[in-house]
Amino acid sequence: MAFIEKGQEIDIGAIKAETQLSAEALRLKERRDRELADIMSGEDDRILLVIGPCSSDNEEAVLEYALRLSALQKKVADKIFMVMRVYTAKPRTNGDGYKGLVHQPDTSKAPSLINGLQAVRQLHYRVITETGLTTADEMLYPSNLVLVDDLVSYHAVGARSVEDQEHRFVASGIDAPVGMKNPTSGNLGVMFNGIYAAQNKQTFLFHGQEVETSGNPLAHVILRGAVNEYGKNEPNFYYETLLNAIERYETMGLENPFILIDTNHDNSGKQYMEQIRVVRKTLQNRDWNEKIKKTVRGFMTESYLADGRQNQPEVFGCSITDPCLGWENTEASAEEIYATLTK
């Protein structure tokens, strides 16, 4: 039992220097980041749509998707604000399987972390500079935050990480919105405790030194459904659950109440077409209740170029992890959201 060094110490500064945003690209990102913050705080009433592939396994397929999404964003910009999922690290239930671009930048070759780190920055950089979109990623490894803190505009803490103290404390120092998912058990208290920790100042050791954070007022809820003790999925985007979550926001006195509905995972039972119904039902719930309309203001949707999933990367733009909506269904769903909001 041991840690075995497999290479020299990685120079993160040198890797970041290769993909620094130009002054023009930085201005674009900062403008979009301000818009996103205004949406999170309620100053901007547009719907947030965090959307993109389950995992970013193929740079060219992801870029093709990003170009299409950028064009779609322009069509719906007055009602919907899109941040593209560029998810580069994937949690695995038992440690097996594809772990994301950071581990394996080329799915036909053996894992390579040094190449993976470069590939992660390259992909976020290209999406921003070539499409004008900004990006979201899952903070699976808090120690890797320094790799992308200047590029990623939205961070998510996953269902398996939300109870972890380091994730919570690091989230409290991030200068960007952090969505915190309910755990797979569905326990909303665990998630809200995580949000409380993230919204408050914390002192801890990070990268070898003692740090104090300012607290992150944009830490917020992502409802992703749950799995019960019998292994059956239990959605939590329903009317009563939303009111329960809103009541917890009020009781705990948290800042900027905001609920994002994860339309896949256990809200859809990983039946990718069900994502459309989840969105539709949530929009109805918003119409029925003013508190829900004021607080439930976003969706996280898994979508790619081709419908479904595959075990091996044979079809260009088809997920190799969770099944996703293909492009035609993605476009139709976004247009349906837009039409509903325009009524």
Feature annotation, model-predicted:
Residues 303-341:
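Internal helix-turn-beta structural module
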Residues 37-45, 251-256:
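Glycine-rich phosphate/diphosphate-binding loops that line cofactor/substrate pockets in enzymes
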Residues 52, 261, 326:
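Conserved, mostly hydrophobic/aromatic
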Residues 66, 79-244, 265-270, 274-281, ...:
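Active-site-facing alpha/beta catalytic cores
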Residues 1-43:
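N- or domain-start disorder-to-order transition segments that initiate the globular core
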Residues 48-61, 322:
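Conserved phosphate/anionic-ligand binding catalytic regions in large, soluble enzymes, centered on
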Residues 26-29, 57, 92, 130:
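Long, contiguous binding/interaction regions
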